[in-house]
Every structure is written in structure tokens, then in C-alpha cells.
Amino acid sequence: MLSPNLSRLVVCVGAVLLASSIGSFATVRAIPTWYKGLAKPSFNPPEWLFGPAWTLLYLLMAVAAFLVWKQGFGAPGVKLALAVFLVQLVLNALWSVFFFGLRSPLAGLVDIIVLWLAIVATIIFFFRVSVPAGVMLLPYIAWVSFAALLNAAILRLNR
């Protein structure tokens, strides 16, 4: 039988893995076809960078959620912090569905703006429970900020 903390870590990794899998499923078929044909801004990173970047970010997200949950549901702010985390996780998966699956940079942009706000809220709530957990999400908000600019530029260039 798994210890309570190991069980929590497995659930956190599983939740993040599910979100990333949904995103990957929506993305993988569109990259060599639709996405490759889009006009992109000069600051578009090389395609090979996205996989390692998201892998690291998803790992940090899972560990951050675990650090919050490790405090226990009875600790102040834990339930709210994890609820907001789950909201942003759903929005994260939906971005790939909107942008790549539906091939809609506009829907992706709307989603990523709401996602950005949800990540900021998650960071605030995580900091209140666990400073290391909040710090672990700072690269995530930085990357999503960049991704939002990239999304907006792709929308503008392909209208």
C-alpha cells in the first residue's frame, strides 16, 4: 500500500499527465500539417523546444500541487488552491484543443488569456500554502505569457 504522500504525488502526476495527454492528442496531428503552414513571428522558437519545455513545466506543476496537497485538506487554503489549480489545468488542456484541434488561434487566444489569469490566481493561492509550490509555478506563468504573445502574433499574421 502506498503512503498517503506517495498516493498524493501519484494523483498529482496523473492529473497533470491526463491534461498533457489531452493537449498532445489535439496537437500532434496539426503540427506537421496546419501549424507548419501558418505564418509565424520572428520570435517563434524552434519546434523541438516545445516538448522539453512543457515536460519540465508539467513536472513542476505536479510537484507544486503535491506540495500544497501534502499540507492536508484541513490546512487553510489547500482546498481552494487545489480547486483553482484544477481549473487552470483544464484551461491548459483546452488551449491545445482550441488552437490545434479546432485550428482556431482566436479561440486559443481567448482561452490563454483566461488561463493566464487562472495561473496567476493559482500562484497566489499556492504561495499562501507553500512558498516552494508558488515558486515552482513561476516558470509556467513566464512560458504561458510568452505563449500568449506568440498566439496573438500568429492570429495577427494569419488573418
Where are these regions (language model features)?
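Helix-adjacent hinge/juxtasegments
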Residues: 59-96
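Cytosolic, membrane-interface loops and tails of multi-pass inner-membrane proteins
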Residues: 30-44
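Membrane-interface helix caps and helix-loop-helix hairpins in membrane proteins
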Residues: 75, 95-106, 127-131, 156-157
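Hydrophobic alpha-helical segments of small multi-pass membrane proteins
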Residues: 82-91, 95, 109-122, 140-145
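Terminal transmembrane helical module of multi-pass membrane proteins
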Residues: 125-159
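Helix-coil boundary and interhelical linker segments in multi-pass alpha-helical membrane proteins
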Residues: 1-10, 66-80, 125-133, 159
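Membrane-interface loop-to-helix entry segments
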Residues: 45-60, 104-115
